[in-house]
Amino acid sequence: MRSSIIKEGYQKAPHRSLLRATGLKDEDFGKPFIGVANSYIDIIPGHFFLQEYGRIIKEEIRAAGGIPFEFNTIGVDDGIAMGHDGMLYSLPSRELIADCIETVMNAHKLDAMICIPNCDKIVPGMLLGALRVNVPTVFVSGGPMKAGRLKDGTKVDLASAFEAVGKRARNQISDEELREIECAACPGGGSCSGMFTANSMNTLCEAMGVALPGNGTIPALTKEREELIRKAARRIVEIALDERYAFRNILNKEAIHNAFVVDMAMGGSTNTVLHMMAIAKEREADFDLRKINEIAKEVSHIAKISPALYTVHMEDINRAGGVNAVMNEINRRGGVLKTEALTVSGESMGERIAGAKILDTQIIHTLENPYSAVGGLKILYGNLAEQGAVLKTAAMDAKMRKFTGKAVCFDSQEEAIAGIVGGKVKEGDVVVIRYEGPKGGPGMQEMLSPTSLIMGMNLGDKVALITDGRFSGATRGACIGHVSPEAAEGGMIGLLQEGDLIRIDVEEGVLEVLLEEAEIQKRRASFSPKTKTVASKWLKRYQLLVSNAASGAILKTEL
């Protein structure tokens, strides 16, 4: 056992003495020590109930013959942090969470781990930490929230609430109507109900085989979710001492490939690209951004979920057969999935999904009737994004797939919000929000407030937006993020001027400004990136060490 180093031999009497103070008995020292990495926090709707899930997991681990040690990570609610400087801390929190996992697990030499994430950066943070620790690990999230309903039965979710702000700004709805949406959008505990970042990442945990079936879709606070929690706890005890299930044996290049296949089939959040590239770097898996476009050509988009389609939420995907049904349908086109990949369940991915059926073809489409013949994400390149930019094609209007418009430039999200509300953005424009990348922000804020304002003002099929920042999973429209290189590192996005013509072509995979090379060089000769004064010591360290979005915004280990 890895934990032998803290519990065996006469030299470890002091260590055992400390462990006895926590309640351990003689017979417990021969059992596997299992870390229970929880992320309980009261302020996040997807996490306030995880303390109870942690209790259930510890109960099951003890009953199955293991010794659980629960610890907690931090968490940030991206929705609550949205639209103010709190969002600067969201992406950096991923790195803190990874560091927490590594620190606790390696300091105490625990044998195995079960991770209980749910929302936004907590899932990828725990995945990164688990890769560093490399012990048998099972992921089991808190589960998705159910969709809300208005009095007339209309389904709503958090994206509805954000877009309602834009409608209220244009007096398209009353204060009373806004309040009804506000009170209905998030009806209870769970990760926000659409295919936003949290549910995208929890779904990809299934696709990578690090979680049991149902992890991404079984609603929170249900009997079915509790049973999944219990099964995961029993499973970690079964594999705790089996080196075949060391985390890097499960989360490898094949698992990353499968994650992107499911991402394409279900139209996941653009944040998944950022997080999966970080995971690939941590795993030392050779996975280039261009590979994503290759996968997209092979994978049909067969499940459209909010924000792409407001009538469908994760509970509907669960009822229609879940992730296994999506994967098995995609697998009908042989050679797309890496079916030999091992899962924490013990079977290969091919064995896991075999026999899974679509139970409602109105929710999960067949290969013969896809929403699109290609996947729901696209990486764009061009003189505006030499290292790439990300677009969620699954949630944009078809008429915007070829678009040329005039640049309206803002040097921060706050400037953009004021400009949009103030009427500066008009039909045919391309909103440019820069100096919001990993270094420029610092922290790479999500642009849900400006994108929601654009949608709420009925400009979603008339205006595009590009940024070196990123988007919420709830974002929809012609919104292109993660533009690399970013403005703060001298990227072309920083050289743009008001009125420049920007061309977007999804089919060709192009994002470019229509300028002569001589003009670009003239601007570059006199260009000096803006710098922001950062008061926070943590954000200063982050700004110093963070890489760009094309590399997953991971922290460098050398200056």
From Swiss-Prot:
> Per its UniProt record, what InterPro entries does this chain match?
Dihydro-acid_dehy_C (IPR042096), DihydroxyA_deHydtase (IPR004404), DiOHA_6PGluconate_deHydtase_CS (IPR020558), ILV_EDD_C (IPR056740), ILV_EDD_N (IPR000581), IlvD/EDD_N (IPR037237)
* Protein name, as recorded: Dihydroxy-acid dehydratase
Q: Identify the cofactor(s).
A: [2Fe-2S] cluster; Mg(2+)
Q: According to the UniProt entry, what is the EC number of this protein?
A: 4.2.1.9
Task of the protein: Functions in the biosynthesis of branched-chain amino acids. Catalyzes the dehydration of (2R,3R)-2,3-dihydroxy-3-methylpentanoate (2,3-dihydroxy-3-methylvalerate) into 2-oxo-3-methylpentanoate (2-oxo-3-methylvalerate) and of (2R)-2,3-dihydroxy-3-methylbutanoate (2,3-dihydroxyisovalerate) into 2-oxo-3-methylbutanoate (2-oxoisovalerate), the penultimate precursor to L-isoleucine and L-valine, respectively.
Q: Which GO CC terms are listed, alphabetically?
A: cytosol
Q: Which family does it belong to?
A: Belongs to the IlvD/Edd family.
Naturally occurring in which organism (per UniProt):
Wolinella succinogenes (strain ATCC 29543 / DSM 1740 / CCUG 13145 / JCM 31913 / LMG 7466 / NCTC 11488 / FDC 602W)
What is one Gene Ontology biological process annotated in the Swiss-Prot or TrEMBL record?
Answer: L-valine biosynthetic process
Residues at the catalytic site:
472 (proton acceptor)
Recorded catalytic reaction(s): these are:
(2R)-2,3-dihydroxy-3-methylbutanoate = 3-methyl-2-oxobutanoate + H2O; (2R,3R)-2,3-dihydroxy-3-methylpentanoate = (S)-3-methyl-2-oxopentanoate + H2O
Q: How does it assemble?
A: Homodimer.
- Report residues binding [2Fe-2S] cluster: 119, 192
